């Protein structure tokens, strides 16, 4: 397999952001890995990190609301094929707070960890498989995926094949 380390896509609106999340889930399902998968979601306030998370979580068969974990730090979704942990570390004042909540216990097998504002937990979080950078592009968004591990490269390679 050729190493593929970057991928970008123009996202027109909120619906397209959710569809892109579903596309990522389709690729993850094709890989059929039981490993923990970690995405760092990077972008300014309002760029669509939580919207992308909602698209991913709903594509994994969650039928309820997907809310931002800004005040709770983490929302857990125990779904049929995978557990998803959606973190929002924006309000984290000290990375050591993550130790008190048992952060290392979240990164176990067969889970997907979506982490907004990961830089606030630097040194205590699992390594990201994918860095997901969401950038304003006028009223739309540009998403850039950067592989940080072999698993991240596999995700991007599959994604590239499907588009």
Model-identified regions with their sequence ranges:
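N-terminal pre-Walker A segment at the start of P-loop NTPase domains
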Residues: 2-26
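Short phosphate-coordinating micro-motif centered on Lys-Gly-acidic
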Residues: 2-7, 98, 104-163
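Phosphate-binding P-loop
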Residues: 27-35
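Short hydrophobic/aromatic beta-strand immediately N-terminal to the Walker A/P-loop
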Residues: 38-40
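P-loop (Walker A) phosphate-binding loop of NTP-binding proteins
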Residues: 42-44
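Conserved lysine of the Walker
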Residues: 49
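Short beta-strand-centered segment that lines the nucleotide-binding/catalytic pocket of NTP-utilizing
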Residues: 62-78
């Amino acid at each position: 397999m050729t190493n593929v380390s970057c991928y970008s896509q123009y996202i027109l609106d909120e619906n397209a952001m959710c569809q892109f999340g579903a596309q990522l889930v389709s690729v993850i399902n094709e890989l059929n890995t039981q490993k923990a998968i970690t995405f760092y979601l990077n972008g300014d306030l309002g760029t669509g990190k939580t919207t992308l998370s909602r698209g991913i979580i709903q594509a994994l068969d969650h039928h309820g609301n997907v809310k931002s974990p800004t005040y709770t730090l983490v929302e857990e979704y125990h779904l049929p094929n995978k557990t998803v942990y959606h973190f929002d570390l924006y309000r984290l004042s000290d990375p050591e707070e993550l130790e008190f909540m048992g952060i290392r216990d979240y990164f176990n097998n067969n889970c997907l960890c979506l982490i907004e504002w990961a830089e606030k937990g630097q040194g205590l979080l699992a390594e990201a498989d994918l860095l997901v950078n969401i950038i304003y592009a006028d009223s739309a968004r540009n998403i850039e995926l950067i592989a940080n591990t072999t698993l991240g490269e596999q995700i991007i390679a599959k994604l590239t094949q499907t588009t």
